């Protein structure tokens, strides 16, 4: 796992982190995507969602309105909150693209996993700057993983 240098810290359980890794491998060479559910200040669930893009799933992801609502329902079911989203970058670094920036919403965490040749790699966490001009890398910590 790669941690960032920003001042925002996102804590995630080992189970949620493993779910992101597994989803990235399962969908390779396409991008995976899903929702991050926070309960008590910790991401406890990485809720897999279908990638509904029509612009080439190997380079893009899209979460449709129905799946967004399903994410909110999952958060309510867990008595938590929708904290953000995750997706994979097949055969590319775990850094946000311009497309990621263009599609991002404020106040969410964005976790990106690099999956190279179907092997999970670095995982990073990003937050949209208040002026929406860029992402700032945050720190992703998993208390039970070193």
Language-model features: locations:
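Conserved beta-strand-loop surface patch within small alpha/beta domains used
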Residues: 1-82, 90-146
């Amino acid at each position: 796992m790669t941690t960032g240098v920003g001042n925002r810290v996102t804590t995630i359980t080992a189970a949620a982190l493993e779910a992101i890794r597994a989803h990235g491998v399962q969908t390779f060479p396409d991008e995976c995507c899903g929702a991050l559910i926070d309960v008590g200040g910790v991401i406890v669930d990485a809720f897999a969602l279908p990638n509904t893009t029509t612009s080439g799933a190997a380079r893009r992801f899209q979460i449709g309105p129905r799946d967004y609502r399903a994410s909110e329902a999952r958060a309510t079911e867990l008595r938590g909150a929708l904290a953000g989203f995750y997706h994979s970058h097949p055969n590319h670094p775990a850094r946000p693209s311009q497309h990621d920036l263009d599609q991002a919403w404020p106040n969410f965490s964005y976790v990106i996993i690099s999956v190279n040749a179907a092997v999970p790699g670095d995982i990073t966490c990003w937050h949209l700057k208040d002026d929406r001009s860029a992402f700032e890398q945050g720190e992703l910590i998993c208390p039970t993983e070193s």
